[in-house]
């Protein structure tokens, strides 16, 4: 039985101790003696945010399919635990084994937005890993960055040994195999980085000289090592249908921001908006096979116990098989307590070939604590009320009628319950508890 990195007296003092104990449903456990590479996968934010990230779940599943690799998870501790760890000199640890991150072979950090840059330094500092790549030795893990911010890695380049540019399903196996060959060979850390630099999609900052203009913009960028390419080519998975996908995603112990099954229906976007970073980075558009997605929905619901499905993409309304997929999910799961969340219901509403009327009930917490007394009186009385609320699809008043996430999204999608609309929405903004 594994020993927790934090003592009971610490866990009882901090907020949400379940963030740090691991052992969730579908978390992967392996014997350290049977593996060759230990990889710590980090989302540099609090547990509730990191556990909701699909990219981490995909790589976690892909790595752990290999018998010679054990991929574990690590997130940024909240302020209370951060203070305790510094005071008691407790090194940051992985959730699965509870072992210190500094003892791993790799620390992979996904960099989704610039606001997490300081969290990256927190992760390195708490892990007792030298902040600057040039100061690390053979006793330290290789720190690799991935995610959309790696397309402009220079602001944080000195903290990373290497960056993975692009989608993670293509080149990681080659990197892990190269590490296995290097490990125990007696070669230097630099020699491994030279081998890694030859893998398409990997950028090793040590092997490049960057010069800047007075205004901070990049002036020149040239390799200083014979093994470093002049241009690093981003990685793209052209066949997303056959790419690895987690059929058994880890189920968190506590409520997280995306506490549901997530089906990635496509990558890329046809819109081409110049202000949208994701639209530029994830070109071209690639769709997953609709039959495969149907099977994914069944398997993931069965393996997790989740009661909701979310369809994920940059522009779900542009998925060519959207009507078939949504109709199938509604028909298949309508009597099984499953809600299909979709940001593009208006696609169905605009479909001229849709011959059915769709009635969507949205029962979610609103700004009110429980149903208003006036609504209860209306339900109990025998009077007829013909005066509608100012919003035609809401059942009773919100505390703030000018701003609510659900209401704002429905308005944005153009869902107005007009007579000609095939899709009608009823929004019940109430939190059901023992008082209701």
Protein language model regions, located:
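Short connector loops at secondary-structure junctions
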Residues: 67-88, 150-151, 360-368
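Helix-enriched interaction subdomains in cytosolic or periplasmic regions
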Residues: 1-16, 66
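Flexible loop/turn segments at secondary-structure boundaries
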Residues: 47-50, 79-82, 115-117, 150-153, ...
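Glycine-rich beta-alpha loop elements in corrinoid/cobalamin-binding modules
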Residues: 77-223
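Secondary-structure transition/capping motifs at alpha-helix termini
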Residues: 65-66, 130-138, 182-185, 256, ...
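Catalytic cores of carbohydrate-active enzymes across secretory and cytosolic contexts
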Residues: 302, 327, 331-334, 339-436
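N-terminal [4Fe-4S]-dependent radical SAM core
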Residues: 10-40, 47-48, 205, 211-262
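Radical SAM [4Fe-4S] cluster-binding motif and immediate context
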Residues: 237-338, 342
